[in-house]
């Protein structure tokens, strides 16, 4: 235990000795730093005193020089020099050339004193020369020095007086549109405009429930149907001979005359009406034309029996429009296209390849067209002038036009002839001539047809079909017969003989598509129906009862 205590006291003593040694070392370093600082302070103090002494000497020299120069500047310019004794002048080496002028001598003494007794600082000399005049001699002006560096821009000066008004400048560009001003007084109400056109047909809705059974209709007129002449039946048995009559008295002999013309048979089987009456008189049976009874009537041969499968020619983006070919001249391959149901421009294509390639020229019409019922006949375009009851004939070659007003025709308030094609007037050309299909403004319900004279551009006759336009989707004319489709343009449900003025039984399919049928027209040059179906340009072959037209 005692040995452990002694070891602990030894360790504490060594620590105390280390601490005292560190304190002694720090004290020695502090004393050395203090001595070094005192030595530096003494050196700096002596250097400062030397600088102050030198500065004082320079100031005294500057003040002495300034006072001397001031004395020289105050001395009179014209004062004579002090007299000199002969010895002095003999000792003066500068007097060998004679006494100089007083002002030259004064200047020489000044220069001598300056060179002998003082070294003048340049700054002091410059200040002296600038403050006193006549002390410093100036030589000739030296060449101008180089231009100095550009100085800083000065402060903005005050605005000057406004100058005179200059000449008027050019018109500047249009500025921005200003704010809307105060609304003016209300003007007089304008005339009431026409109602806008219907929008495009929407999608077909869901099929509704069946309606109630309607009442039985009136019995139809059988005489309106075209009846085909039947085949000749077998000859009946001869009747019993009658009793012989009494002989008559002989007549006087007649004179011989020329043979008269042969009279045609009255009952030859080719009658102008809708039906042919076959007489029961046996005396006329043998004289009738047996071959004629085996043929159909000309009117029946002109009827359409069916429509063939369509061929698509082109697909365009416009829903409404027409594409037309010349009906009369088969050598003219041009095709004309009008886009939309209203416009003033017509596209003319050289032929069908140009139509497919999109190569065309524009033709500007004299009036806006309306509808999709235009035709081209003998190098002239016939169309409806928009917003009026007027037809226009525009000749392509001469670019001249004629107009024809159709009295009592419906052409406004969106009361279209055919709502599916936005059309008021539908023109048509067939083997019988030029026609126009329209609705009357008197009743506004029935479909009317007018035949036009191409030469005089006038109306020849009007035909009232009495068929309501509300049941019609579209229509066309072929070989003098009007054909009307249903409201969906899928079947032909009505036909009317325009030359005979009678209704004809007709009911056949037209197409299977339910797209918008904007145009439907018959062309007699190729016996096809031309249609515009929701942008599809289609051709339908037509099948007649007879392939040739009997006049």
UniProtKB/Swiss-Prot annotation:
Residues 137-195, 196-222 form the Collagen-like domain. Residues 299-546 form the Olfactomedin-like domain. Specifically expressed in spinal cord, brain, placenta and sciatic nerve. More abundant in peripheral than central nervous system. Residues 191-200, 213-222 have a biased composition (Basic and acidic residues). It comes from the Eukaryota. PANTHER family: GLIOMEDIN, OLFACTOMEDIN-RELATED. The olfactomedin-like domain mediates NFASC/neurofascin and NRCAM binding. This is Gliomedin. It comes from Homo sapiens.
């Amino acid at each position: 235990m005692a040995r452990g205590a002694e070891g602990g006291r030894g360790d504490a003593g060594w620590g105390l000795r280390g601490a005292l040694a560190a304190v002694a070392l720090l004290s020695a370093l502090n004393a050395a730093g203090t001595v070094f600082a005192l030595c530096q302070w003494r050196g700096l103090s002596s250097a400062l005193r030397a600088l102050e002494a030198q500065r004082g000497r320079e100031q005294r020299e500057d003040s002495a020089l300034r006072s001397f120069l001031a004395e020289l500047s105050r001395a009179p310019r014209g004062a004579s020099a002090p007299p000199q004794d002969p010895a002095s002048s003999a000792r003066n080496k500068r007097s060998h050339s004679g006494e100089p002028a007083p002002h030259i001598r004064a200047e020489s003494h000044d220069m001598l004193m300056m060179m002998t007794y003082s070294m003048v600082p340049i700054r002091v000399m410059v200040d002296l020369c600038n403050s006193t005049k006549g002390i410093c001699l100036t030589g000739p002006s030296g060449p101008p020095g180089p231009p100095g560096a550009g100085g800083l821009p000065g402060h903005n000066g005050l605005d000057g007086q406004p100058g005179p008004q200059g000449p008027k400048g050019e018109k500047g560009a249009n500025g921005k549109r200003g704010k809307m001003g105060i609304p003016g007084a209300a003007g007089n109400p304008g005339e009431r405009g026409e109602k806008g056109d219907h929008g495009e047909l929407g999608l077909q809705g869901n099929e509704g429930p069946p309606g109630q059974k309607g009442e039985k209709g009136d019995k139809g007129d059988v005489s309106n149907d075209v009846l085909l002449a039947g085949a000749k039946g077998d000859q009946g048995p001869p009747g019993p001979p009658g009793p012989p009559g009494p002989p008559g008295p002989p007549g006087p002999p007649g004179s011989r005359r020329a043979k008269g013309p042969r009279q045609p048979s009255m009952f030859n089987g080719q009658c102008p009406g809708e039906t042919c009456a076959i007489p029961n008189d046996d005396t006329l049976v043998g004289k009738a034309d047996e071959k004629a009874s085996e043929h159909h009537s000309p009117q029946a041969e002109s009827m359409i029996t069916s429509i063939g499968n369509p061929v698509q020619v082109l697909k365009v983006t416009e829903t409404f429009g027409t594409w037309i070919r010349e009906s009369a001249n088969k050598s003219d391959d041009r095709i004309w296209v009008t886009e939309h149901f209203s416009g003033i421009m017509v596209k003319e294509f050289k032929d069908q390849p140009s139509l497919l390639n999109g190569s065309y020229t524009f033709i500007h019409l004299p009036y806006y067209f309306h509808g999709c019922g235009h035709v081209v006949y003998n190098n002239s375009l016939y169309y409806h002038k928009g917003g009026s009851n007027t037809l226009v004939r525009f000749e392509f070659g001469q670019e001249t036009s004629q107009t024809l007003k159709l009295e009592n025709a419906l052409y406004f308030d969106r009361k279209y002839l055919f709502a599916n094609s936005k059309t008021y007037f539908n023109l048509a050309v067939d083997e019988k001539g030029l026609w126009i299909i329209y609705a009357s403004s008197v009743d506004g319900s029935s479909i009317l047809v007018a035949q036009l004279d191409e030469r005089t551009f006038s109306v020849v006759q009007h035909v009232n079909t009495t068929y309501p336009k509300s049941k019609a989707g579209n229509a066309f004319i072929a070989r003098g017969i009007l054909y009307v489709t249903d409201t969906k343009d899928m079947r032909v449900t009505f036909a009317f003989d325009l030359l005979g003025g009678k209704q004809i039984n007709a009911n056949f399919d037209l197409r299977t598509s339910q797209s918008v049928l904007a145009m439907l027209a018959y062309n007699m040059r190729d016996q096809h129906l031309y249609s515009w179906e929701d942008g599809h340009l289609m051709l339908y072959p037509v099948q007649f009862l007879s392939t040739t037209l009997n006049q």
